[in-house]
Amino acid sequence: MYVLGIETSCDETSAAVVKNGRKILSCVVSSSLKFHKKYGGVVPEIASRMQLETITQVLDSAIKEAGVELKEIDLISVTSGPGLLGSLLVGISFAKAISISLGIPLLEVNHIYSHIYASFLQPQRPQKVRKEREEFCGFRGDLATFAVLPFIGLVVSGGHTSLFYVRDFKKIETLGQTLDDA
């Protein structure tokens, strides 16, 4: 099964292809950071405009890097929040257009929960990885460490820094979160 992930919750545009729920085949990111620097932070309007300009190229690069064709994608996953409204709309609209035009199911996902799930993906890494490094990171051959449920998950992501109790991957309880917005 091939899943296309699209992420546009803030100032970056990203697309990735994951095989069988865990193996990352590609991950392409386009950042608009240089356009925001002179303002001292992310400007939502600039972020969404840059995403409109780059999202097609990011998708094409992710599909090509994964070595698959768009028609081989079985599911499209897209960030639906939290995030900047304009940026989220770019990603969701783009994902829905692909979903409808090619008849591929669409799954909207919570950006913060995705940080928890990302811990269990098998990352791309060079063929020559020292054994000690593999063991330190919890990798065994082609598999990343699986979760032992339940567990506590910590996500440190700006104004959305949170501590979660993960009963299973469909039951996540927020134990605490930051009160600031940055």
Predicted regions and their residues:
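Short acidic/glycine-rich loops and adjacent helix/strand connectors
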Residues: 1-182
